[in-house]
Each structure stands twice: as C-alpha cells, then as structure tokens.
Amino acid sequence: MSTMIEVRDLTFAYPAQEEEQQQGTVALRNVDLTIEKGSFVAVLGHNGSGKSTLAKHMNAVLLPSGGRVFVAGMDTLDEQQIIAIRRAVGMVFQNPDNQIVANVVEEDVAFGLENLGVPSADIRRRVDEALAAVGMEEFTRHAPHLLSGGQKQRIAIAGIIAMAPQCIVLDEATAMLDPAGRREVLATIQTLHRDMGITVVLITHHMDEAILADRVVVMNEGSVAMDGTPTEVFTRVEELEEMGLTVPDTVQLLHRLRAAGYDVPLDALDVEACADAVFGALN
C-alpha cells in the first residue's frame, strides 16, 4: 500500500486564551503516525486525548505547531497545496445540522461541486452516484431538516463523496446520533471502504465502532498510546482501563469466561462471532 497520510513528530498547542498566559494548551506531543491508502483506521481516546485535534490536522483545518503532516505527499504547511489537500481528504463532523447548507438534499450534495465550477452535467451525475452510494437516492428532493440525524450524516457523507476524495475522516460523526442513526452511518462507512476503496479514518469514543476497523490507534494525553489490530489493542484491558477507556462488552464477556476456565477465543470481537464462541464453549 502507498501512504495516504503521514504524521511526523507532530506537536500542536492551542493559543493561550488569556493575555497573561505565556503558553497555550498542548494538545498533541510528538505524534508519529502513517495511514495507508485503502485502510480503515479507528482513532480512540477519552475527551481531551487529542484525537479530534489530530483529525483536524489530516485535512489542514489545523496546522502543526511543530513537526509535519503530509497528505498524499503534500505538506499541509504549503499554502499552495491547501485546496488540493482538502479535496483529497473530506471531513464529516459531529453535528449533522452544522453541515447542511441547502434546503433540498440534492442541492446540498451539489454545493461543493458548484463552488469548484464543475459542469452541470457532471454535477448531476456525481450527485446521483453519491446519493446512491450512501443509500439516499430516494431523498433527492427532500428537505434536509426533516431527515433523521443518521440520514443527515449520510447526506453529509454524500457531499464529501461527490468531491471524489481519496480519504474520509469522520470526527465523532456518530456521537449525536441515536442507536439506529449510528448503525446507518457505520453501515455506510463500511460500504464505502469495501466497495469504493476509500480510506477511512474514524475518530470515536465508542469502542464497539472501533471493532469494525482494520487498525486501532489509541490516543492518550496527546500521544499515541497504542497502535495495532482491534484484537491486539482490546486484549490490553487493564491498560485501556487505566486510560479511562472501557473495552467492548464482547471483550469483557470473553475475558470473564476465560478467567472462569472456559476455552473461548479472545479475538471474537463482534457480537455474532462472540455469540458463536460462547455457544461453542458452553456446549
């Protein structure tokens, strides 16, 4: 795989809020991270761990105080590359209402393309394809404000897809959704990754969401504390708990069964695999 995003010794401090403060809050400290094209990476951490600050560096919403961030080989500190960087990496944020800019779904999805001066025929095709990709093609003429939270986030994702990015970063994109909305958005993300080969970076505090990824990065106090497959990360239960993180229910169950003497695999992380493992151990 080739590199999509490369973070080199990244340090970032938010500006001081008061004049008497000499230094701002340091949110990231010497972070090194490489994300390969076509991968699905979940970034976990409690509030204040630096995960959202890291996400905002991935398409130059924030710029490094120290170190470098490269997106598809482009340095985010190079002002001439900012537009190309933001076209390469699209971002979906936490509040779906803050991302709606039009009164009709298809117009909202077309907004970015129109600003780029894309020909009308191409806009029509790309909007239709993007809405189909997120399963919202039947809502073309609907008013976005009448949609559910999950549907609004899927519209936001469609607007990003229409711009043909190489990577999508979702910064706590399911945090304000009900369980049904979360399932809708997560299913959409999985489809885009599997069928379109889009690189996905999922910033989340929901452990069960991270199970879906190929790789899990855990942030703590502005640094990378863990980096590995979901199985590698979630078997380090005590370390995660020390960082204020609770492992998925499936992991807790498997560890309790193992402690009770049952021969269950610790890598059966999703609900279906866990159920099969428990059934097999008890029979």
Spans of model-derived segments:
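Helix-to-loop junction immediately C-terminal to a conserved catalytic motif
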Residues: 59
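Conserved ABC transporter NBD signature motif
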Residues: 67-77, 85
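Conserved ABC ATPase "signature" region
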Residues: 121-139
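Catalytic Walker B motif of ABC-type/P-loop ATPase nucleotide-binding domains
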Residues: 168-171
